[in-house]
Amino acid sequence: MYKTTGLTHLINSTKYSLQGLKSAFKNETAFRHECFLACILIPLTFFLGETKIEIILMISSVLLVMALELLNSAVETVVDRIGTERHELSGRAKDQGSASVFIALCIVGIVWGGILFF
């Protein structure tokens, strides 16, 4: 298989990333919800954050949730591709992916709560 380099590699990588975002938005309800919330929360950071670092932390915490949701969706897709029958390892993989999103949501709560209330 021919491996691209340079500008061609960058263009192809960007194309594949955009395809992944489009696929997640089309197929994953949770990702659509998180995109909707990000469209509200990210602009709010410029009004609620008092310093540049607060704004950066608030935006980064929201984007972290979205990134982990993409990884969680990828894990679920691969597990479902392997087979739809119940298996302990498949369940653990899906649960752990979900737990990573939950922890990211806790981080959002800590960051936003810490900035807004302390």
Curated annotation (Swiss-Prot):
Known catalytic reactions: a 1,2-diacyl-sn-glycerol + ATP = a 1,2-diacyl-sn-glycero-3-phosphate + ADP + H(+)
GO cellular component, one term: plasma membrane
EC number annotated for this UniProt entry: 2.7.1.107
The UniProt record lists the keyword Disulfide bond: no
Membrane topology, from the record: Multi-pass membrane protein
Gene3D superfamilies the record matches: 1.10.287.3610
Primary location recorded for the protein, binned into one broad class: membrane
GO biological processes: phosphatidic acid biosynthetic process
Residues where a divalent metal cation binds: E28, E76
The protein's name: Diacylglycerol kinase
Organism: Haemophilus influenzae (strain ATCC 51907 / DSM 11121 / KW20 / Rd)
Lineage per the UniProt record: Bacteria, Pseudomonadati, Pseudomonadota, Gammaproteobacteria, Pasteurellales
Gene (UniProt): dgkA
